[in-house]
């Protein structure tokens, strides 16, 4: 069973090893794939969940995610309580299990065939993704009848922010929540892009490499998926050919607003 683990532990962090080990106790045949996202970045986690989950996957694929900033209640929390564990089943057959925090389920809420709460405690450990959730995730993966709770209302999940940085890839390309519309794109047009305190000129194009070396492109990237109505969304990327757009804009965090002029 392919199990994608999307979490904000940090690449190479001991936490990934501990979580993999604990899940494997309950799912011995699991094949883990680790995808780190920045600390507390539910938008990056949500983007990764959709990009992985809404494309063809091996039968039985599971996405287990944990980005839990515990921002659902600002008061002191007894017993290390935090956001609850939730479940989604996608049209691809991929099952998603993880904390319903921030934007974690935002990119899939309107596509999911099923949204349910998991029948799991939301407290009991500072490290719930190791000590509490693996057993619950395994119960869901194995189809145990008592593993799921009530339906989760998609309207209670926030929509993704518009015109924001969603994810930064290893090349420093900035994947955004700006949807590509071929009817509105005029290749070659020069625009000004501002993120936080940094502002740079970019060239609008229909492909990232359609600009000279050293130029910044505003173009449809490699990320996107099929929506409920059968249409396909592709997300705009900021791509610095031969460099890092992330560094150019002073390393903006996922969630940063992208202003276009």
State what each model feature region is:
Residues 3-5, 63, 166, 238:
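Residue-level marker for buried hydrophobic side chains located in beta-strands
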Residues 14, 18, 40, 44, ...:
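Conserved active-site and cofactor/substrate-binding residues in soluble primary-metabolism enzymes
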Residues 177-252:
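A conserved acidic, glycine/proline-rich C-terminal tail/linker
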Residues 1-38:
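N-terminal glycine-rich anion-binding loop in soluble enzyme alpha/beta folds
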Residues 108-192:
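Anionic-ligand-binding alpha/beta catalytic cores of soluble enzymes and soluble regulatory domains
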Residues 9-13, 171-174, 243-245:
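Short acidic, Gly/Ser-rich segments with clustered Asp/Glu that frequently serve as metal-coordination loops
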Residues 26-46, 58-133:
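Active-site histidine-anchored catalytic micro-motif
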């Amino acid at each position: 069973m392919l199990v994608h683990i999307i979490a904000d532990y940090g690449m190479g962090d001991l936490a990934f090893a501990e979580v993999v080990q604990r899940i494997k106790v309950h799912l011995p045949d699991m094949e883990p794939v680790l995808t780190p996202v920045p600390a507390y970045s539910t938008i990056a986690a949500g983007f990764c969940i959709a990009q992985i989950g809404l494309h063809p996957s091996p039968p039985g694929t599971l996405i287990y995610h944990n980005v839990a900033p515990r921002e659902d209640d600002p008061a002191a929390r007894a017993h290390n309580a935090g956001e609850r564990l939730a479940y989604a089943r996608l049209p691809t057959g991929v099952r998603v299990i993880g904390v319903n925090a921030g934007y974690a389920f935002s990119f899939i809420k309107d596509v999911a065939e099923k949204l349910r709460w998991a029948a799991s405690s939301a407290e009991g450990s500072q490290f719930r993704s190791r000590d509490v959730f693996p057993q619950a995730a395994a119960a869901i993966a194995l189809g145990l009848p008592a593993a799921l709770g009530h339906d989760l209302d998609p309207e209670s999940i926030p929509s993704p922010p518009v015109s924001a940085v969603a994810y930064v890839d290893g090349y420093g390309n900035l994947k955004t929540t700006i949807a590509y519309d071929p009817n509105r794109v005029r290749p070659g047009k020069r625009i000004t892009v501002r993120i936080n305190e940094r502002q740079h000129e970019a060239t609008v194009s229909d492909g990232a490499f359609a600009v000279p070396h050293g130029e910044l492109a505003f173009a449809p990237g490699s990320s996107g998926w099929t929506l409920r109505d059968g249409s396909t969304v592709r997300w705009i990327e900021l791509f610095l050919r031969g460099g890092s757009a992330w560094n150019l804009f002073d390393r903006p965090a996922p969630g940063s607003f992208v202003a276009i002029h």
